[in-house]
Amino acid sequence: MSLSETVEPSGIVELAVRRRRGDAAETAVDRVGQEWPVALVFNGISHAVMMCTPRDLEAFAVGFAVSEGIVERGSDVKDIEVALHGAGPLPHAEVQLTVVQQAFAALKEKRRALAGRTGCGVCGIESIGLLDLVPQRLPDTGFLARLAPDAIARAARELPAHQALTRQTGGLHAAAWCDASGAIVHAFEDIGRHNALDKLIGTLTLTRADMANGFVFLSSRASYELVRKSARVGIPMVATISAPSSLAIEIARQAGLRLVSFCREAGYVDYGTA
């Protein structure tokens, strides 16, 4: 990877604000999470612009490529260049990925199939199968049987210690990778919950971790996109602090992924795998 123009941003901006409590007002310094447009470019063709916290962008780009099915494995990404443009009225970044020709040809074909659609990208599609929402059913690797009874409680207890940016801003999501005991091995924060997960998946891909031998713990709600991304890369369980959506539950059950939500040290709700 090459990194151009500037060092990686901190993820936080300090701003002067007026803070009011009751009848009193004062000038203070507030910390807010950075949000940049990040362009993802595959083999010279711009594919998407995502709004992200501008940290860990190499991991984010790889995780996005894998979890969205653009590439099948990390080795399909041959080169990554991250360009940070922090000066000017609109700071932004561009990530250039060079992928194998087979993956690029499939991406171009997918883009042609989507060309001409308007609106949300879902309207007008004839069947849910064409949405590519439900990945292949996950094999039973035995991980869930090895999961410690207090693993979810441990992850819930440990997550705040890995949320340094959230402690300062109150406005970021976290995605953590946990082992069978619930110990947190990796954790990433981002302004977008799906971005945080992509950063985590990218790191697991780049380090060649066994994604069938752990689970994801998220500080957010469980949306369909988080479940779909996790199932696509073979993660057997997703745990979230907040509520799931009905589509997230349906996708999890069809994929054979265990989804647990409302996770706290005291308990959780298990939405099952079947």
From Swiss-Prot:
One GO cellular component term: cytoplasm
Compartments where located: Cytoplasm
Record carries keyword Cytoplasm: yes
Residues annotated as catalytic: 120 (cysteine persulfide intermediate)
InterPro entries given in the database record: Cytidine_deaminase-like (IPR016193), FdhD (IPR003786)
GO annotation, biological process: Mo-molybdopterin cofactor biosynthetic process
Gene3D superfamilies documented for this protein: 3.10.20.10, Cytidine Deaminase, domain 2
Keywords carried by this UniProt record: Cytoplasm, Molybdenum cofactor biosynthesis
Short name of any one Pfam family annotated for the protein: FdhD-NarQ
Entry keyword Cytoplasm: yes
SUPFAM superfamilies: Cytidine deaminase-like (SSF53927)
Molecular function GO terms recorded: sulfur carrier activity; sulfurtransferase activity
Job of this protein: Required for formate dehydrogenase (FDH) activity. Acts as a sulfur carrier protein that transfers sulfur from IscS to the molybdenum cofactor prior to its insertion into FDH.
UniProt record similarity statement: Belongs to the FdhD family.
Record's protein name: Sulfur carrier protein FdhD
